[in-house]
Amino acid sequence: MAKVKICGLKDPDMVAFAAREGADWVGFVFAPSVRQVTLAAAETLLLSVGKATPVALMVDPSDAEAQAVAALGFPILQLHGQETPARAAELKSLTGCAIWKAIGVQTRDNLGQIGTFPDIDGLLLDAKPPEGATIAGGHGAAFDWSILKGWTAPKPWLLAGGLTPENVAEAIAATGAPGVDVSSGVERIRGLKDRELVRAFIRAAKASEQP
Ligand SMILES: O=C(O)c1ccccc1NCC(=O)[C@H](O)[C@H](O)COP(=O)(O)O
């Protein structure tokens, strides 16, 4: 059974709903995005996570920004920018958070950099942002899952990018992903999660067979 992260939540009721439906992680975006939350909003959202684990998503944060987010009590920091292995290690020791690094995948070569991040705790394999995009993630674009054929993950990992309730079972079967992450695929209006889609995604992922 694959684990599920619902990313880009902004509304406490939706956070509670996703957690009740069985989301393992709920993600909050602290970067420019239609899904961005403030520190004050995140403090309120954290009250609704139930049994789900909250993940703070940041893009090239400064020390002060990362420390302010970590101080809210997030156990996991997902880095979605151009953070180097050294910066990821630095942010880990600075915040005390587990670090997940997002890796943009377009070709098999992109997987090579993963070995240069020995200090991180997890990986999120996501599609690269479309040409000209100024936002680092949440574009609803998938990469070619066959790139992962024969790849052995050195860390716990999640598959992301363009997943939907309709394709998540196929994605898990094709890649063997132990976890999946979704943002746009559970929205009907950009930036607003939809209960029916959140429920359908979690059910489809949890019911799926890993190869
Ligand atoms: O979701 C955002 O708005 C976002 C903004 C800036 C950096 C990262 C962002 N999201 C990162 C995620 O973990 C998304 O869930 C991931 O990119 C997959 O998104 P989608 O293809 O929309 O499901």
UniProtKB/Swiss-Prot annotation:
UniProt xrefs under Gene3D superfamilies: Aldolase class I
One annotated GO molecular function is:
phosphoribosylanthranilate isomerase activity
Determine if Amino-acid biosynthesis is one of this entry's keywords: yes
> Sorted alphabetically, which CDD domains does this protein's record hold?
PRAI
What SUPFAM superfamilies would the database entry show?
A: Ribulose-phoshate binding barrel
What keywords sit in the KW lines? Amino-acid biosynthesis, Aromatic amino acid biosynthesis, Isomerase, Tryptophan biosynthesis
Domain of life from the UniProt record: Bacteria
Enzyme class at the top of the EC tree: isomerase
Question: Member of which family?
Answer: Belongs to the TrpF family.
Protein name from the UniProt record: N-(5'-phosphoribosyl)anthranilate isomerase
Origin species, per record, is: Hyphomonas neptunium (strain ATCC 15444)
